[in-house]
Amino acid sequence: MGNTIFNYLSTLRIFSLIVCMLLILMCATHDIQAQNTLKEKQPSARSNTMTEKTNLSIGKKFPEVKDDSLEKTPVFLPDAARGKVTLIAVAFLRESQSQIDSWLEPFVESFGNKEGFTFYEVPMLHWGYKFMRFMIDGGMRAGIPQEKHKHVVTMYGDVEKYIKALNLDLRYGYAFLLDREGIIRWEGQGFSTPETLKALFETAERLAK
């Protein structure tokens, strides 16, 4: 009886390992395809191509995101930001990190310590990556200052749902400015510029009045 149980557990472990390997392979294939799209279509590593999108998401409520922050606390967006003017930066690829940083860092510097404002960074990953969450989130915790952990919420799930809901292109990072009710009032794509940052700041100040 004991040997039978151990044989069963051994078989179960092998099966689980195979499933995990297949999921990792699926995720890697998804990433390679996305990166190839990025390399083939992205016009410049430092471009900011707002002309490719007409801000169709403005006026919509930001779609619900439910996941844990790097602080290991559950966060429900946009409800967690209700009552505040909020910048949410979204990225799908590693290559987009510098793009969303170009929005987040100036915003945090100008509004991070002001009452009535908040911000979130939301990396969006395919659901298959959830099996590697402890490694991914652990690496992010090591590279991000602890005081910002509560502002980073990695979404593991149906990425395509958000791409369709907000009319997004996974090649780019995005910055969404929400009013106190969670409605998108301003949007930025790609890298920020002095002009687009000025527009972001002016809109944030107006929404706070």
Question: Where would I find each of the regions flagged by the language model?
Answer:
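Structural microenvironment flanking redox-active thiols in thiol-disulfide oxidoreductases
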Residues: 95-145
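Short active-site neighborhood of thiol/selenol oxidoreductases, capturing the structured segment around
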Residues: 80-100
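Thioredoxin-like thiol-disulfide oxidoreductase module
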Residues: 134-144, 151-170
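N-terminal secretory signal peptides that target proteins for export/translocation
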Residues: 1-12
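N-proximal helix/coil linker or "cap" segments that precede and/or mark the start of modular domains
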Residues: 35-63
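Thiol-/selenol-based redox modules, centered on thioredoxin-like
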Residues: 171-209
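Bacterial N-terminal signal peptides
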Residues: 15-26
